[in-house]
C-alpha cells in the first residue's frame, strides 16, 4: 500500500488473513516512482503541492493536462514490475529469495493483458530469456523442491512444471501463488502448444497435416486459422523468436524471427501505440506516456512524418556495472536535443530512472528495445 507520504510493504497470508509489516518508507521510493509511472499520476508533484497547502481539487494533473489531481486514475492496461537479479555474478551466493532485497534493478512492462505484460517483462530483464516459454531447457533435478523454495529462476521453474504436466492446483499447493496468476501463465503455455500445430512447408506457414485433417479437411480456413493463431500469440506477448521456435523453424533462429515478422506484417498483424492517460480514454488526454500493444486497432497518437525527431535508447534495467550514470547520459542527450530545437523521443522501461519522467522528453515509449519493437515507431 502506498500514498504520497509513506509506503508500506506487507506479507499477507491469504488463508489465515494474517499479515506482517516488512518495510515502511516515510518518503517517496522506487515503488512510488513505479506507481506514478504505471498510472500516469504525478505522485511527487502532487505530494509537494499538498505539503504547501493546496487541495487535490486545486491541482491540474500535469500528465493528462485535462483532469484535476482529485480524479482517480482509471487503467485500461496491465503493468508488471519484474526485478532483475544478478546473483550469478557472485560466487557462492544464496539464490533463495525471502523478505530481504537481493535484486539490483527492475523493469516495468505494459500490455493490454497480463500475459502480454509478463512476457514483455521477462524479455526486458535482459538475462537471456525470451518470455515465459520457448527458452533454453532448464535442468531441474527436483521440480517439487524448486517450486517450494523460491529462487531467481522460480517463474521458469513454473513453466517447466506446466510443460511436465503439473496442474494449476499442484503448482498452487507448492508455491502458494494465487491461482489467478497461474491460470494466466497456463494460458501462455496453452498458446505455445497451439503454435506447435503450425509448420513451414515450401516456405509457407501452414497447419500440420494431421491438424489440417481434423480441423479443416477441405483446407478452406487454413489461412484464417494460421493468422488467428499468430494474432493470439502476439496479443499474449509472444516475440517473433518465440513463435519461430514454437513452430519448429529449422536453421538460424534470427532468420526464423525475421521470417515470422515478414509473414505477420503481410497478414496485417501489427502493434498499435496507446497512451498511458490515467483516464482509460474517458476524456481526451495529451499525455506523452506511450506503449505498444497488439490488442488494438488504431494508434492513440498521430505522427507528423516531418523527420524532426531524434530517438534516444535508454539503458534498461540497472545491473551490476550499469546504473544511474548511464541513464544520466541519456537525460543529457534529451536535454541537448530539445535545446537544439528537435523533438526528443526516449525508449526505456526502467521506472527508477530520470529518463522515464514524463517531463524529460516529448515522447516516452515504455517499451522493449528490440528489432521487432522500435522499428514500428515513426516519431
List PLM regions with ranges.
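Conserved small/polar residues in nucleotide/adenosyl-binding loops
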Residues: 1-8, 200, 207, 225, ...
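ATP-dependent carboxylate activation and anion-phosphoryl transfer catalytic cores
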Residues: 2-194, 229, 233-237, 255, ...
Amino acid at each position: 500500500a502506498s500514498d504520497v507520504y509513506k509506503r508500506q510493504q506487507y506479507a499477507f497470508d491469504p488463508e489465515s488473513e494474517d499479515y506482517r509489516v516488512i518495510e515502511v518508507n516515510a518518503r517517496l521510493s522506487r515503488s512510488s516512482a513505479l506507481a506514478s509511472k504505471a498510472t500516469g499520476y504525478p505522485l511527487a508533484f502532487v505530494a509537494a503541492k499538498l505539503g504547501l497547502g493546496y487541495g487535490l481539487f486545486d491541482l491540474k494533473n500535469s500528465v493528462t493536462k485535462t483532469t484535476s489531481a482529485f480524479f482517480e486514475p482509471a487503467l485500461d492496461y496491465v503493468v508488471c514490475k519484474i526485478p532483475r537479479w544478478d546473483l550469478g555474478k557472485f560466487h557462492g551466493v544464496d539464490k533463495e529469495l525471502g523478505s530481504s532485497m537481493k535484486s539490483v534493478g527492475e523493469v516495468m512492462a505494459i500490455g493490454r493483458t497480463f500475459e502480454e505484460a509478463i512476457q514483455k517483462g521477462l524479455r526486458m530483464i535482459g538475462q537471456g530469456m525470451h518470455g515465459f516459454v520457448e527458452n533454453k531447457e532448464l535442468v531441474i533435478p527436483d521440480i517439487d523442491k524448486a517450486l517450494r523454495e523460491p529462487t531467481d529462476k522460480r517463474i521458469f521453474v513454473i513453466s517447466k512444471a506446466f510443460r511436465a504436466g503439473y496442474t494449476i492446483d499442484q503448482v498452487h499447493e507448492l508455491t502458494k501463488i494465487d491461482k489467478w496468476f497461474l491460470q494466466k501463465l497456463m494460458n501462455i503455455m496453452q498458446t505455445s502448444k497451439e503454435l506447435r500445430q503450425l509448420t513451414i512447408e515450401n516456405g509457407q506457414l501452414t497447419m500440420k497435416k494431421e491438424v489440417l485433417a481434423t480441423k479443416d479437411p477441405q483446407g478452406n480456413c487454413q489461412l484464417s486459422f494460421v493468422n488467428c493463431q499468430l494474432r493470439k500469440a502476439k496479443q499474449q506477448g509472444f516475440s517473433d523468436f518465440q513463435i519461430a521456435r514454437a513452430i519448429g523453424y529449422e536453421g538460424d533462429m534470427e532468420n526464423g524471427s525475421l521470417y515470422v515478422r515478414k509473414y505477420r506484417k503481410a497478414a496485417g498483424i501489427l502493434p498499435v501505440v496507446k497512451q498511458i492517460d490515467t483516464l482509460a480514454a474517458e476524456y481526451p488526454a495529451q499525455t506523452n506516456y506511450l506503449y505498444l500493444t497488439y490488442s488494438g486497432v488504431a494508434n492513440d497518437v498521430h505522427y507528423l512524418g516531418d523527420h524532426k525527431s531524434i530517438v534516444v535508447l535508454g539503458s534498461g534495467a540497472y545491473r551490476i556495472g550499469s546504473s544511474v550514470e548511464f541513464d544520466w547520459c541519456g537525460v543529457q542527450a534529451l536535454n541537448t536535443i530539445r535545446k537544439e530545437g528537435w523533438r526528443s523521443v526516449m525508449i526505456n522501461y526502467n521506472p527508477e530512472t530520470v529518463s522515464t519522467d514524463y517531463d524529460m522528453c516529448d515522447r516516452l515509449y515504455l517499451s522493449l528495445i528490440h528489432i521487432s519493437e522500435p522499428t514500428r515507431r515513426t516519431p
